[in-house]
Every structure is written in C-alpha cells, then in structure tokens.
C-alpha cells in the first residue's frame, strides 16, 4: 500500500491570529525552529539554557535562581506548581472569577488539598479585603492562588499588596500569569510572588509547548521540605531543579 497520493505535505493557510493565544510568531522565531536539533546535554544546548534563564528572569522581573522553561503548556505549569506546593490536607485560598480560577481549584483538590474558594462575578476581580478576611478565618493557610489576567474574561487582578499580606499570614503566593507575562509587567520580586507560571503562546508570541516558571527561595524551601515526594514524577520540580542547576545539570526529562 502506498500513501504517496493519499497524504500530501501539509501547507497551513495563512491566518491572522487575533485571540489571546496562540498568537502570531515572529519570522525570526519560525526560522529558528528549522535549525538542526541538538542533544539535551550538548554543551551548546546547556549554554542556551543559561541564556533562557537569564532572559526569563528579566521577563519575570526576578532574581529567583529557579527560573526555567518547563516542557509543556501553561496548564502543565499550573499543575507543576500546584502538585509541588500543595500537599494532602493543605488549605489554599483560590480566587475563582473565571475558567482558570476554577481549574486551579480542581487541581488543588486533585492534589489532596482543601481549596477555599473566594468567588467573584466573571469579569470582576478578587477584593484584597476578602483575601485578608479569609486568611484570618481559615488559618493556617498554605497558599493564596490567584490568576493575574483571567483569559476567559480579560479581568486584571491587582497584586501589588497581596504578597505582603500573604507573608503576614505565613502563606505562599501563587500566581497564574499565562495571559499577562510579556503583555503587562509581572513584578515577581517586588510583589512578593512565590511561584509564577506562564505559557509561551500568548503575549510572548512563541509557539506553544513551554511553560515559563519561576519559584522563590521561600517556595523552593516548601518544595524541598515536603512530607512526601511530589505525586508527579514528570513535574517534580525538585528533580527538574537539578537539571537546570548550573553545577550538576543532572538529566531528568
């Protein structure tokens, strides 16, 4: 049986992509995708990893050592952060004002955590007063989880004062920046964010398939001190950290 006439080379039609993602990709990026492959432990590839980390730190506005590009979509970044920072029985306050706040609550449940939902109408944001009241009422709380820019509605969540509030209650701050990173400032260090993830196919205007991710030393401390290993081997950030470590670069994926 021959497939010569049945299947032809795929030539995609030209589209002007105007949605939140995937977005248009610069021709220079498309050209880079046509270059020969390198092995994942090739010295040139390892040097490229250093460059990627430096550029992502600038994009996230952070000095976090653990700043990487995770293999997977933005949802993989979401699941990696939740699976590593939320353990069974942990309480996590999650802002639910759209599709992705709802997804975060679901992932917290699947990790054995106890999501405390603060709901707002779709298109609205989560008031900081509601976060403060819930942090006091539900203590101890492991983390506050918020979507910076809710893709399903376009709502932009103010974050400037949330990090300090979380620290006052010994809670981590987890932020979904899938739609916002590269489009508006994401001030990870200034805002006191402990874990932040994004996706390459939105405002960064890259092909999908990578999840930029950064975790503060405080967040990495919580991961290293887990009561049990992360239930996901593939998304275990303690293992992935060793692959991105400047000194060891131990193979993981």
Regions found by a protein language model. Name each.
Residues 17-19, 68-71, 94, 117-118, ...:
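General beta-strand structural signal in soluble alpha/beta enzymes
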Residues 103-114:
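Active-site-proximal loop->helix
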């Amino acid at each position: 049986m021959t497939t010569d006439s049945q299947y032809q080379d795929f030539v995609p039609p030209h589209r002007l992509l105007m949605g939140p993602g995937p977005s248009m990709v610069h021709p220079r990026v498309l050209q880079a995708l046509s270059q020969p492959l390198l092995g994942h432990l090739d010295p040139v590839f390892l040097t490229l990893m250093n460059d990627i980390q430096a550029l992502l730190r600038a994009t996230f506005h952070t000095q976090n050592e653990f700043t990487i590009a995770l293999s997977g979509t933005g949802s993989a970044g979401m699941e990696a952060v939740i699976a590593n920072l939320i353990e069974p029985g942990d309480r996590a306050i999650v802002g639910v004002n759209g599709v992705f706040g709802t997804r975060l609550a679901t992932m917290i449940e699947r990790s054995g955590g106890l999501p405390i939902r603060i709901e707002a109408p779709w298109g609205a944001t989560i008031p900081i007063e509601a976060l403060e009241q819930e942090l006091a009422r539900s203590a101890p709380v492991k983390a506050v989880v918020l979507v910076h820019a809710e893709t399903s509605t376009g709502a932009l969540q103010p974050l400037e004062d949330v990090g300090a509030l979380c620290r006052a209650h010994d809670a981590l701050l987890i932020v979904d920046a899938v739609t916002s990173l590269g489009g508006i400032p994401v001030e990870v260090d200034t805002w006191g964010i402990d874990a932040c993830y994004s996706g390459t196919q939105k405002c960064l205007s890259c092909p999908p398939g990578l999840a930029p991710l950064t975790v503060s030393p405080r967040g990495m401390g919580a991961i290293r001190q887990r009561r049990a290993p992360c239930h996901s081997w593939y998304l275990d950030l303690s293992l992935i950290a060793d692959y991105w470590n400047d000194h060891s670069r131990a193979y993981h994926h």
